């Protein structure tokens, strides 16, 4: 199917409103990208996952009068002399879902753990295999931040431990922890679609009896765990420090990712108040910060 793309530079505060308006005037799809063309995959507990400088990309049918779209954007004050935009034409829209499924293969993380798409055979039946169908939620293991978290979990002794996956997306981290030996896990997310995807993946892996799922505003106030992992972004990690740090039991383990290497020091400066931090692990400009809750 032929399509026309309009790409508009926006800000954290305006991107969601612009997205809603684009859908109202006929866009068939709206996505967010940061300034480095990295997809913004999922909302975080308590807020929307957006960088400060965000590009909003909307697709329209090839027959759309883009001059009229631009006029409507200007009329609604979503487009002004300070808003940069580009319009692209004569490209073909791929069957992205089919292509993504064809390219998603089993992946190994650490020594024991494999993440396997539910439509493929497992490569090692004796390994710890997590069967995954992400649906519309973020988290397949292909992104460096997810990979760093999975490798960290694989390296922990999770036997009889409790785990919290803060911003659970597809549930991949919580489910992996359970299959690696954790006694119980809790997944938290703001998006009902993430809760649904996590529940479906838990059923696929036979761990529904050990996994609790909560929307962020419904989680128990006294919730704590031996291991807490949060694969979100540097800004929210710092803002949510009081909440995240309170989730960790005494001498418990914390794993943070979704952080660019250039942002690692500022996140470390925040969490070193109450955590004994380990050396930062990095991959493809992203990094993971881990540590133990300090004891008094």
From Swiss-Prot:
It is found in: Cytoplasm. One of its GO terms (biological process) is methylation. SUPFAM superfamilies: S-adenosyl-L-methionine-dependent methyltransferases. Signal peptide: none annotated. InterPro entries: Ribosomal_L11_MeTrfase_PrmA, Ribosomal_PrmA_MeTrfase, SAM-dependent_MTases_sf. GO terms for molecular function: protein-lysine N-methyltransferase activity. Its EC number is 2.1.1.-. Keywords: Cytoplasm, Methyltransferase, S-adenosyl-L-methionine, Transferase. S-adenosyl-L-methionine binds at residues 146, 167, 189, 231. Coiled coil: none annotated. HAMAP family: Methyltr_PrmA. Methylates ribosomal protein L11. PANTHER family: ELECTRON TRANSFER FLAVOPROTEIN BETA SUBUNIT LYSINE METHYLTRANSFERASE. This is Ribosomal protein L11 methyltransferase. It comes from Haemophilus influenzae (strain ATCC 51907 / DSM 11121 / KW20 / Rd).
């Amino acid at each position: 199917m032929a399509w026309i793309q309009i790409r508009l530079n926006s800000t954290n505060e305006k991107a969601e409103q612009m997205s809603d308006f684009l859908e109202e005037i006929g866009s068939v799809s709206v996505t967010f990208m940061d300034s480095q063309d990295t997809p913004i995959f999922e909302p975080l507990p308590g807020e929307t996952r957006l960088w400060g400088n965000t590009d909003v990309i909307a697709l329209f049918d090839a027959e759309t009068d883009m001059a009229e779209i631009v006029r409507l954007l200007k009329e609604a004050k979503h487009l002004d002399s300070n808003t940069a935009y580009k319009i692209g034409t004569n490209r073909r829209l791929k069957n992205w879902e089919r292509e993504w499924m064809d390219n998603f293969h089993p992946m190994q993380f650490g020594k024991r753990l494999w993440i396997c798409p539910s439509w493929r055979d497992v490569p090692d039946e004796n390994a710890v295999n997590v069967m995954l169908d992400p649906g519309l939620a973020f988290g397949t293991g292909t992104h460096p931040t997810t990979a760093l978290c999975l490798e960290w979990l694989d390296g922990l002794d999770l036997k009889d431990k409790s785990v919290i996956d803060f911003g659970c997306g597809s549930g991949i981290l919580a489910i992996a922890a359970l299959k690696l030996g954790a006694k119980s896990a809790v997944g938290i997310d703001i998006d009902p679609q993430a809760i649904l995807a996590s529940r479906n993946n838990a059923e696929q892996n036979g761990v529904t009896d050990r996994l609790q799922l909560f929307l962020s505003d419904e989680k128990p106030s006294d919730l704590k765990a031996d291991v807490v992992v949060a694969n979100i972004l540097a800004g929210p990690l710092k803002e949510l420090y009081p909440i995240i740090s309170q989730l960790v039991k005494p001498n418990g383990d914390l794993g943070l990712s979704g952080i660019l290497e250039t942002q690692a020091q500022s996140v470390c400066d925040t969490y070193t108040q109450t955590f004994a931090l380990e050396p930062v692990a990095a991959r493809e400009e992203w990094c993971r910060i881990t540590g133990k809750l300090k004891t008094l």
